[in-house]
């Protein structure tokens, strides 16, 4: 009876997942795999595969998201560790509230605020105060993704460090290891799960973000993946073929993203399992 109650508690979650994720994804897959207005599936996918627009935008988003993850991890890891070791609860609450501002404030307001600040700083340096749209280049898009998505790396690491058993570090120090060795051999392996969670929460939103490049990069030379799909979707209001191509672009991007995730997360585990079984097989003979 107790187990059945747990299943009932999971019902709202599965209901929301079905309405807002499974059904839309099923519609996207069906739209991407059916012909539109007499055009075959190959004709619908040909502009995506033969042209460089999709792959250029995917590559731009990929390197921006990878650099965002690296910068966010390098900043958040030591910061969260030392913050979790602080005994001042008021200080920790204040720092957490400041660090997580980009999460609980409006996405659009954050972009407008960052754009205004950058225009002001660049205007002061160029003696062009009052001019707008002074941000040109993918570097500003990268700056925006770092600013917006670093808190998603911060929270998993901080919550994980708060439950780090202090006796592990003390035991390492009692064995004669210095602080750096203890940090590398104890703290980093302990936080592996939190790092993977933070990487996933930072990488995928940065990869598929839409409005950041439109707001912060006025050169429009390097279109991101989110903007590319958004443009196809806008054209889809008047053309069923463009709508189908937008769905196809989402499917291709999802497959490539899944391949990256599988290579980074699951493939090392599979290799480790196969390697261990091979060792056991060799020992048996």
Swiss-Prot record:
It is a multi-pass membrane protein. Residues 58-268 form the ABC transmembrane type-1 domain. The keyword Transport applies. GO terms for cellular component: plasma membrane. It comes from the Bacteria. Keywords: Cell membrane, Membrane, Transmembrane, Transmembrane helix, Transport. One of its GO terms (biological process) is transmembrane transport. The chain crosses the membrane at residues 10-30, 62-82, 94-114, 136-156, 196-216, 247-267. Coiled coil: none annotated. It is found in: Cell membrane. Required for the activity of the bacterial transport system of putrescine and spermidine. PANTHER family: INNER MEMBRANE ABC TRANSPORTER PERMEASE PROTEIN YDCU-RELATED, INNER MEMBRANE ABC TRANSPORTER PERMEASE PROTEIN YDCU-RELATED-RELATED. Belongs to the binding-protein-dependent transport system permease family. CysTW subfamily. This is Spermidine/putrescine transport system permease protein PotB homolog. It comes from Mycoplasma genitalium (strain ATCC 33530 / DSM 19775 / NCTC 10195 / G37) (Mycoplasmoides genitalium).
